[in-house]
Amino acid sequence: MKIGFIGCGNMASAMISGMLKKGLYKKDEIIVSNLTEEGSKRSREKLGVVTTLDNHEVVKNTKLVFLAVKPQFYEEVLNEVKGELTPEHTVVGIAPGKTLAWLEEKCGQPLKVVRMMPNTPAQVGEGMTGVCANEKVSAEELTQICEITDSFGRTEVVPERLMDAVSAVSGCSPAYVFMFIEAMADAAVAQGMPRKQAYQFAAQALLGSAKMVLETGMHPGELKDMVCSPAGTTIEGVRILEKNGFRSAVFEALQG
């Protein structure tokens, strides 16, 4: 079965790259639409997939359609292509705030609809994606969707009521992590370390720490305690972070 993308920006490109690397689809089984010939040329050169400037061609030639345009263009795109949609199609939205009910309504008929929230680390094959689907999507079809998202990271199926939480803890948080890496690097630079080297130390520390959480299954607090020696510099740093509201600031940012 062919797969289609309406829009082919950074996120769609990351998703397609993952699918191709894992061998889920061949290049000629993926069709993407772009607004401009320049965009189509870029997609062909970077990904080697079939390209078109016509969104209708994507829908007519595939049964699994990803909406990979910016959220403000969703309604316009669905109004454009809903005449070609059939009950055999599965429509996948990857934009925040577009609910399953909203997507189904804008499709103009009862359809198989999936909502997913990938994040920017998908661009390096380390994404985290939350997925939910309406009742028309079979377990087998949902498994197929998850195989796709697993090709560029990890996947969790969640009830739709948690998708806003997914957006916060997974979609927005990379920006906060980048700020933390930058702050750690700044501190190292202040002590004389070259900036490029400081970024390496800070980023690898976060990468390794994250892998410890995922691979050991231990509670993050327990892992933290393992690093904190009595009367040591690490526990003193923890004290300073707690004093300055580190946890509260993160909590409030994710609640916003």
Each model region followed by its residue ranges:
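Rossmann-like NAD(P)(H) cofactor-binding subdomain of soluble oxidoreductases
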Residues: E37, K46-L47, N55-K60, L64-V131, ...
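NAD(P)-dependent Rossmann-like dehydrogenase/reductase catalytic/cofactor-binding core
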Residues: A203-G256
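Internal alpha-helical scaffold of NAD(P)-dependent oxidoreductase catalytic cores
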Residues: W102-K112, M128-A165, F178-E215
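NAD(P)+-binding Rossmann beta1-loop-alpha1 motif at the extreme N-terminus of oxidoreductases
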Residues: M1-L53, V189-Q191
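Small-residue helix-packing motif on alpha-helices
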Residues: I30, S40, V58, P194-F201, ...
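A short glycine-threonine-serine/GTX helix/turn-capping micro-motif
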Residues: V166-A175, K196, K224
